[in-house]
Amino acid sequence: LKKITPEDGFHEIIIFNSGKYFIDSFSSLKVPKKILIKSLPNGELVHSIDETDLNQFVNYEWAFPKIVSFPSRDGKVNLDGKIIFPPDFDSSRRYPVIIHGYGMPGTQIVKNQWSRVWHQYLAQNGFIVFSMDSRGMGGRGEDFKNYSYGDISKYLAEDHLAGIDFLISS
């Protein structure tokens, strides 16, 4: 196998019916969305459809998220979280925390992808924004996703409590 999307981040691919080209729509924690047309089989850039200008965010004190990992309460798995701190964050101060939880099977919140504008707005207004993936969510393999099979709520609350434990201990 040869990787043909070398750019860091989360990629969504659409292959043309001809099989000769594909659209690569991607972003990362530090790079806003880009949409490119690339050729197959080598991934060579053919055309840039759209590229978000990072400079437009300078006046907004865009806070880059940090991906973290912490143990579940039962110690069976490590869970992933994403934290956005206020731009002027001072570790000696206390801040209100907004927890963005979802937890539906097969979905994934924590990924190397440009963050939501709403979360940035909250951070710029003095909130710490914490998102996490509980057991049963996607992007971590079939075994991790199947934790919620037959009982979606079994780990959801416990895993979110582990996230809160992590925040308190940090």
Go through each PLM region and give its residues:
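Serine-hydrolase catalytic core recognition
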Residues: 5, 12-170
